[in-house]
Amino acid sequence: MWGLGARGPDRGLLLALALGGLARAGGVEVEPGGAHGESGGFQVVTFEWAHVQDPYVIALWILVASLAKIGFHLSHKVTSVVPESALLIVLGLVLGGIVWAADHIASFTLTPTVFFFYLLPPIVLDAGYFMPNRLFFGNLGTILLYAVVGTVWNAATTGLSLYGVFLSGLMGDLQIGLLDFLLFGSLMAAVDPVAVLAVFEEVHVNEVLFIIVFGESLLNDAVTVVLYNVFESFVALGGDNVTGVDCVKGIVSFFVVSLGGTLVGVVFAFLLSLVTRFTKHVRIIEPGFVFIISYLSYLTSEMLSLSAILAITFCGICCQKYVKANISEQSATTVRYTMKMLASSAETIIFMFLGISAVNPFIWTWNTAFVLLTLVFISVYRAIGVVLQTWLLNRYRMVQLEPIDQVVLSYGGLRGAVAFALVVLLDGDKVKEKNLFVSTTIIVVFFTVIFQGLTIKPLVQWLKVKRSEHREPRLNEKLHGRAFDHILSAIEDISGQIGHNYLRDKWSHFDRKFLSRVLMRRSAQKSRDRILNVFHELNLKDAISYVAEGERRGSLAFIRSPSTDNVVNVDFTPRSSTVEASVSYLLRENVSAVCLDMQSLEQRRRSIRDAEDMVTHHTLQQYLYKPRQEYKHLYSRHELTPTEDEKQDREIFHRTMRKRLESFKSTKLGLNQNKKAAKLYKRERAQKRRNSSIPNGKLPMESPAQNFTIKEKDLELSDTEEPPNYDEEMSGGIEFLASVTKDTASDSPAGIDNPVFSPDEALDRSLLARLPPWLSPGETVVPSQRARTQIPYSPGTFCRLMPFRLSSKSVDSFLQADGPEERPPAALPESTHM
């Protein structure tokens, strides 16, 4: 697979000797051969290097590349000056020299099959899946001009210039024709996306400049492959046999290959989005669909002789919105890290094997004039093409490309493994000077990656190019940006112009009305309250950072430095179970579980020692983490159970929410929570005494002060209801709905009719039946306080200005005192005629 040579068994013999020594030291008999030797006896251990040679060598090379990457980043001074790609090429040269010194043969090399089918797809898929779509499509015209016109310009000018110098006799006697020079020019025109990503990510240029260079490197590969195939077929036919019809077919082939590859990528993107819509019950295999279907788009385009790079790029671009909305948060994290890991590993292996492949004397043919003139021509014509195309673009671009940006664009035309793989694919029988082309390509790749990669960062700093800012846009910026988009879209619509904003608005409307309904699951299509989602994420981050800070300082740091902020922000009181949510269970679990006698000690003991013990006890009880139950970690092939850290973070989040709600109420009402609880308790006991003296527990209408309590049987969850799913709760938003039903609301004392307090019949009963985990038991006793947490899901369900009550009639004493007595309606006359 890696172009292994024939001397593998010799290296395996050395490894066999080493393993044999270890085995004999351990008392194990090791003899070469099969399971039965010449003596006919059974051998305990046999050495089968040839059986595992290929996968073992591949695993070792991946391990060496990964360890080298770790070693590079141990010294920040080196990586801040030298690009990682250049270091990997140098490492490959060193390893290739060691292998050559041991075997005197190029045992390992980067073959085109391995590069195009196994190493390049993960890199391009990662670039497409994480592509900033708005920035990419906003500069799509500029990117296409540089990718199409610029690539044709570079290929034609480089090939024709080299052919002109060859005719002058400066290159000596070479067996090269015009078509051979044009074929070589098409190879040199390929700006490699791997090299561009590796260098420009470390430079951190501004977003517009980066997306132009990166987009050009992605899209110009289609033009490069088309030109390569056209000129290779012309070379096979011979210059005398090429007709005008063949040239027209070559031009048509460019559009077919480019547009066909793009269409294949879009079709597979929609297929991937549609498949992930129905993976709700098989979450564990969601990441597999993302990688398999994307890779199938690449292979399908390669099978149809279309642009495979464009196919997998647009597959990632078009599917990212729908896939991220359909899959779970855990699957999205898996896809993100796996894709980054594969892309980084493939990039590391590519650059290292570029260095290893160069250590092979049999591929080198030196021609000083050809090599130097190639370097000069690709640099000069790249700069000329950028200047001419930018002059044309600036006449229509709103944001002009400054001369400094043009210098970076000209200097960023890096060549890499794409050019090397294409030149290795050349047929040596048809292209007589293949070794010269290979040698020159290696020199060009090393020059652009190492020299230009080393100097581009100082050049950017010297020219004071605008750098990218790694920060989140503020809320004010987001609001104004969205407002400007709507305003510009309206202006273009009124004036009759079709611009970027008009097209973006029409596409958003089409996507929202048709595509999202087909490619997104229904739960993802619902309008969600983003403010609540952001609040949910902030609380989770707050809980995680709080626990991390506590672990860093030590478990008893709260005792040594108790601060007011820590007391207010986090509450480590027990929370209710998600399975049992009845009022009786909540009241039972509200009792302190540790040393109940400490409550009475505060009233009797007054010594300093006792006071310190009580403070220490209550501090430990409040702040140390107390697990609810012992979780049984069972293995499951089809489900991904949440880890202990996720459960603890979720529990701390609920405690934080409960503490903040209590702090908010006490601040708003200006009451102490202990005094308030005592008043409520006294009022409740008085109400019970009054109810006990009245038959059926109903107060007359003339009573000036009425109160009511919640019936426990009305608030208990039914046994037939499903318990809430923990995984869906982790990935969902915050729900501020208490368990109030219409039946409960109708069973209440009499009072004044008020339609404001009547419950909404259109509201879903299942939503009302869910009790927030952070809602304290006191909330279920006082309906007026519980109503403060009943925030609707979205503006579409915001139906009233007043909170829900358990009764459709007001029971406030002052309203009953001021309101008129209820009287039967007066009988109307049968006829109201005069």
From Swiss-Prot:
What clinical condition is it connected to?
Answer: Diarrhea 8, secretory sodium, congenital: A disease characterized by watery secretory diarrhea with prenatal onset, prominent abdominal distension after birth due to dilated fluid-filled loops of intestine, elevated fecal sodium concentrations and low urinary sodium concentrations.
* Predominant location category: membrane
Determine the domain of life of the protein's source: Eukaryota
Instruction: Spell out the residue ranges making up region: Interaction with AHCYL1.
Output: 591-695
Q: Which key words are in the record?
A: Antiport, Cell membrane, Disease variant, Endosome, Glycoprotein, Ion transport, Membrane, Phosphoprotein, Signal, Sodium, Sodium transport, Transmembrane, Transmembrane helix, Transport
Q: Where is the signal peptide?
A: 1-25
Q: Which gene encodes it?
A: SLC9A3
Q: What's the impact of mutating residue 382 to Q?
A: In DIAR8; decreases cell membrane localization; strongly reduces Na(+)/H(+) exchange activity
Gene source species? Homo sapiens (Human)
Q: Where is this region: Disordered?
A: 679-728, 814-834
Query: What is the name attached to this protein's record?
Result: Sodium/hydrogen exchanger 3
Q: Per its database record, what is this protein's job?
A: Plasma membrane Na(+)/H(+) antiporter. Exchanges intracellular H(+) ions for extracellular Na(+) in 1:1 stoichiometry, playing a key role in salt and fluid absorption and pH homeostasis. Major apical Na(+)/H(+) exchanger in kidney and intestine playing an important role in renal and intestine Na(+) absorption and blood pressure regulation.
Q: Where does a 1,2-diacyl-sn-glycero-3-phospho-(1D-myo-inositol) bind?
A: 138, 141-142, 398, 497-498, 500
* Chain intervals with Acidic residues compositional bias: 717-728
Family per record: Belongs to the monovalent cation:proton antiporter 1 (CPA1) transporter (TC 2.A.36) family.
Question: What phylogenetic lineage does the species belong to?
Answer: Eukaryota, Metazoa, Chordata, Craniata, Vertebrata
| Topological domain ranges for the Extracellular compartment | 26-51, 103-111, 169-181, 238-244, 305-306, 360-367, 427-433
Q: Which positions does UniProt annotate with glycan attachment?
A: 241
Q: Domain comment?
A: The C-terminal intracellular domain is subject to extensive post-translational modifications and binding partner interactions which regulate transporter activity, scaffolding functions, downstream events and localization.
